[in-house]
């Protein structure tokens, strides 16, 4: 896994240029490799000055794949963005005469070099036909009118060493647009129905263009690749990156290794990735087709097309406006031109095509705006990155009077109809992976869908009529259904007529590398988790090696060796029962088969821990942390919730298998008035009165804030039983997480910052729980022979429940909603704990990786 930090060992290799509503968009050519840097020194901006010589010519050079350096002028796809084109670029390279299609009267025309594309008899041999030439002039069918066909092996012309990959990316394509079907988008619908598709693909947070396009290219979260927003401030650079500024041309902002650089480094040619908006879509398609016709030693293997639509129209009209139909038709028409062009070149059974979006679109207007001036008196002292999310920093850097915690307090639960929640960034849901970067402000506002946030009314721009400039926007929580986007894979390497579960866009970089036969650079994706998309797999994942093997202690200590300060053993009757209870701890029995349904979790770092068996649960107990790394138990549909006997209330039993020196002591909790304790296995779910004593062992105990204990107790007493009843039994694995540096990775001991007062008991930052059942609820969890279903949570361990504004009410009113907000992937938990789950199962490892990367969003169907 790639390090989830702003400054890792990534190589910053390219200059990313993209802007919405102006004349720039992302673009790279095969040789566009600039200085590799991720430095904090003086900026090295590509200024305008070297590109002043435009006296050369683009004759024979239009959309050349090699970037020409100064002082010569350029004719590549980005020369417009850099104002470096030769003087005749528009005249020679952007021809539009006679349009982009053949008509009957043009068939066999005399070649005219002024035409945008040709319908002459020699156009096929010269590779510059209009894409419908064969259809109109030779009687062939459009690609869309042909039946679906299963392409079992690539059918490529001689000289193609691998199937080329074309990435067709569309901005702001909400997943639900696909419901418009073949009446509006017949070509896209055919790609979907004949190839491999997901009901949606999840973008990364924030669901903005810059972060997501670069995530698609690198497989990294924004906190890892550094592009944390469409605009951002770097306190070390003391510089601001935004759409309309020159700073975005500076290499120092861009981390990671994008696909085209991975390709070039491994000897695979890459074509242009995105395009200046001044270049018409038709010209982009024709250029890609011409590149595909290049000689073998010049032809790239990977290409990309980028469309600014339907994002532009989605902002203007909203996702549900009737005006959205025409932009979608235009995109589909462009897809049809590409596929007809490929068929014309006899490449339609050779090329792999990915049709993919960067994010969705929501119905938003400026009439639904929360103003911070209604909550704060000093809004002029802060800088707010406004809109569908809020990032707050002091207007004056290093202002000693700036107090983010005070601002949080003034923004928390102040109104019953408040449409945002404030967070310190380290308290954001871990699934967002949006904290570990200095460009992410300490104070963050998660905004409710369909709403905006701004400092004050004067910051919101409206038309002179008072109406909004926009009707749609994006950027919200990436689990919200309106933010989901599209994924379709089509071609000889993708499966035929296959629907796959939703996945996150960090996974696509690895797939694209597999399609091109490349070794991926380090990234945040899980390589192999999308193997089920492909007909054949070039990469076969293997189980990670277990680093630390457990100890299996027996009864080694006497009851008298312990002084826990809270024992209740003196209340056990009869007295010889105490010995019997301890003997129970010596027996393994069948607990492993019952409670570790998918094998024992492996520890992937060096430590010492013990396997502790009990009738109702099993634990991996850490001698370092004085608590379990994990506790696993299986609850049947018929399980009953029982009460706790009075004599077991507020007491803990010693565990005679573990040294007193490696056990917690209740005296620590008596000294720390802010801390209480709870149990990883819930005593309420014990199968017998005798088994209940096991649940009160000190080795089942973990530190908990009293406020959090309300959440944990409700989860254990009510929700676990509810899930077991609904799903025909569940297996539950729970444990602590330590992530004080909020980098999304397991803390080492030196990084843990808080302990129960006067003790060596570390205080977790979070607790996790993994709940697994059979996908087919007719099968009980412990007898499942089919696919598995998983729901996972990473619950923040905090001294208050301020995140839930109704936490003063009964837990039934708010705890489950809080848990849904902190839903997570199993992979997130593995990175945060250093554990590896699901190691013993009949399912393939690729299937297990798919399960581990699944996120239960609790959203309605798209």
From Swiss-Prot:
Impact upon substituting residue 512 to A: Reduced lysophospholipase activity
Binding annotation for 1-tetradecanoyl-sn-glycerol 3-phosphate: 209, 230, 311, 474
Keywords, in A-Z order: Calcium, Chemotaxis, Cleavage on pair of basic residues, Disulfide bond, Glycoprotein, Hydrolase, Lipid degradation, Lipid metabolism, Metal-binding, Obesity, Repeat, Secreted, Signal, Zinc
GO terms, biological process: chemotaxis; immune response; phosphatidylcholine catabolic process; phospholipid metabolic process; positive regulation of epithelial cell migration; positive regulation of lamellipodium morphogenesis; sphingolipid catabolic process
Required for secretion: annotated segments: 829-850
EC code(s) of this entry: 3.1.4.39, 3.1.4.4
Cofactor note (record): Binds 2 Zn(2+) ions per subunit.
Annotated glycosylation sites: 53, 410, 524, 806
Residues noted as binding 1-hexadecanoyl-sn-glycero-3-phosphate in the record, renumbered to the chain: 209, 230, 311, 474
Catalytic site positions: 209 (nucleophile)
Record note on what altering residue 249 to A does: Reduced lysophospholipase activity
Tissues in which the UniProt entry reports expression: Expressed in brain and adipose tissue.
Cleavable signal peptide: 1-27
Site (Essential for catalytic activity) location in chain: 852
List of residues binding Zn(2+) 1: 171, 209, 358-359
PANTHER family (UniProt xref): ECTONUCLEOTIDE PYROPHOSPHATASE/PHOSPHODIESTERASE, ECTONUCLEOTIDE PYROPHOSPHATASE_PHOSPHODIESTERASE FAMILY MEMBER 2
Recorded family membership: Belongs to the nucleotide pyrophosphatase/phosphodiesterase family.
Official protein name in the record: Autotaxin
Gene name of the encoded protein: Enpp2
């Amino acid at each position: 896994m790639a390090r989830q930090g702003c400054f890792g060992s990534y190589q910053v290799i390219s200059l990313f240029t993209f802007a919405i509503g102006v004349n720039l968009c992302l673009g790279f050519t095969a040789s566009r490799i600039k200085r590799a840097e991720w430095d904090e020194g003086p900026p090295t901006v590509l200024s305008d000055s070297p590109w002043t010589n435009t006296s050369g010519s683009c004759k024979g050079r239009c959309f050349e794949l090699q970037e020409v350096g100064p002082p010569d002028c350029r004719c590549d796809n980005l020369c417009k963005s850099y104002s470096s084109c030769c003087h005749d670029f528009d005249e020679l390279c952007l021809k539009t005469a006679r349009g982009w299609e053949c008509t009957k009267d043009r068939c066999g025309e005399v070649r005219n070099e002024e035409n945008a594309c040709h319908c002459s008899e020699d156009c096929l041999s010269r590779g510059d036909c209009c894409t419908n030439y064969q259809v109109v002039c030779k009687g062939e069918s459009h690609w869309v009118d042909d039946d679906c066909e299963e392409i079992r092996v690539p059918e490529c012309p001689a000289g193609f060493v691998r199937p080329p990959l074309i990435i067709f990316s569309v901005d702001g394509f909400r997943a639900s647009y696909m419901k418009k079907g073949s009446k509006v988008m017949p070509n896209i619908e055919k790609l979907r129905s004949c190839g491999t598709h997901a009901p949606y693909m999840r973008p990364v947070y924030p669901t903005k263009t810059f972060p997501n396009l670069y995530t698609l290219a690198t497989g990294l979260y924004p906190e890892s690749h550094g592009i944390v927003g469409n605009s951002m401030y770097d306190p070390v650079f003391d510089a601001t990156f935004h759409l309309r500024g020159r700073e975005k041309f500076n290499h120092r902002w861009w981390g990671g290794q994008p696909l085209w650089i991975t390709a070039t480094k491994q000897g695979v040619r890459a074509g242009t990735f995105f395009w200046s908006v001044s270049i018409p879509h038709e010209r982009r398609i024709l250029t890609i087709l011409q590149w595909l016709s290049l000689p073998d030693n010049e032809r790239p293997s990977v290409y990309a097309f980028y469309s600014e639509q339907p994002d532009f129209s989605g902002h203007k009209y909203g996702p549900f406006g009737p005006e959205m139909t025409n932009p979608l038709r235009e995109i589909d028409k462009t897809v049809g031109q590409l596929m007809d062009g490929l068929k014309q070149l006899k490449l339609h059974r050779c090329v792999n095509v990915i049709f993919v979006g960067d994010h969705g679109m929501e119905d938003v207007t400026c009439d639904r705006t929360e103003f911070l001036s209604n909550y704060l008196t000093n809004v002029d002292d802060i800088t707010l990155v406004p809109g569908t999310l809020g990032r707050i920093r002091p207007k004056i850097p290093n202002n000693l009077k700036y107090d983010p915690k005070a601002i949080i307090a003034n923004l928390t639960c102040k109104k019953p109809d408040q449409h945002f929640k404030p967070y310190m960034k380290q308290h954001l849901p871990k699934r967002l992976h949006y904290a570990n970067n200095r460009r992410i402000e300490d104070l963050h506002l998660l905004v409710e869908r369909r709403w905006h946030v701004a400092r004050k009314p004067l910051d919101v721009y409206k038309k002179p009529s008072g109406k909004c400039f926009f009707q749609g926007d994006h950027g919200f929580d990436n689990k919200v259904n309106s933010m989901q986007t599209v994924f379709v894979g089509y071609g000889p390497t993708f499966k035929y007529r296959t629907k796959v579960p939703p996945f996150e866009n960090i996974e696509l970089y690895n797939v694209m590398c597999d399609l091109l036969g490349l070794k991926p650079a380090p990234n945040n994706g899980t390589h192999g988790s999308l193997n089920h998309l492909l007909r054949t797999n070039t990469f076969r994942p293997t189980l990670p090696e277990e680093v630390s093997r457990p100890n299996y202690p027996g009864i080694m200590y006497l009851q008298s060796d312990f002084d826990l300060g809270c024992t209740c053993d003196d209340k056990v009757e009869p007295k010889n029962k105490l010995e019997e209870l301890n003997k129970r701890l010596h027996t393994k029995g069948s607990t492993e088969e019952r409670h570790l349904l998918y094998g024992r979790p492996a520890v992937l770092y060096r430590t010492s821990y013990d396997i502790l068996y009990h009738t109702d649960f099993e634990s991996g107990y850490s001698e370092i942390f004085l608590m379990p790394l994990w506790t696993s138990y299986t609850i049947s549909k018929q399980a009953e919730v029982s009460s706790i006997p009075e004599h077991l209330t507020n007491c803990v039993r010693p565990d005679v298998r573990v040294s007193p020196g490696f056990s917690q002591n209740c005296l620590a909790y008596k000294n720390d008035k802010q801390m209480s304790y709870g149990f990883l296995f819930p005593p309420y779910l014990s199968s017998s009165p005798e088994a209940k004593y096991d649940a009160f062992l000190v080795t089942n105990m973990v530190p908990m804030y009293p406020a959090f204990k309300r959440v944990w107790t409700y989860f254990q007493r009510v929700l676990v039983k509810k899930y077991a009843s609904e799903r025909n039994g569940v297996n539950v694995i729970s444990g602590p997480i330590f992530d004080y540096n909020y980098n999304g990775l397991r803390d080492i001991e030196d990084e843990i910052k808080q302990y129960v007062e006067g003790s060596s008991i570390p205080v977790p930052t979070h607790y996790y729980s993994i709940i697994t059942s059979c996908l087919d609820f007719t099968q009980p969890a412990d007898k499942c022979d089919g696919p598995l279903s998983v729901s996972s949570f990473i619950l923040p361990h905090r001294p208050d429940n301020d995140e839930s504004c109704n936490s003063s009410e009964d837990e039934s009113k708010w705890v489950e909603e809080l848990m849904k907000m902190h839903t997570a992937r199993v992979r997130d938990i593995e990175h945060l704990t250093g554990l590896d789950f699901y190691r013993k199962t009949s399912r393939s490892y690729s299937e297990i990786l798919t399960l581990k990367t699944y996120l239960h969003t609790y959203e309605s169907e798209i």
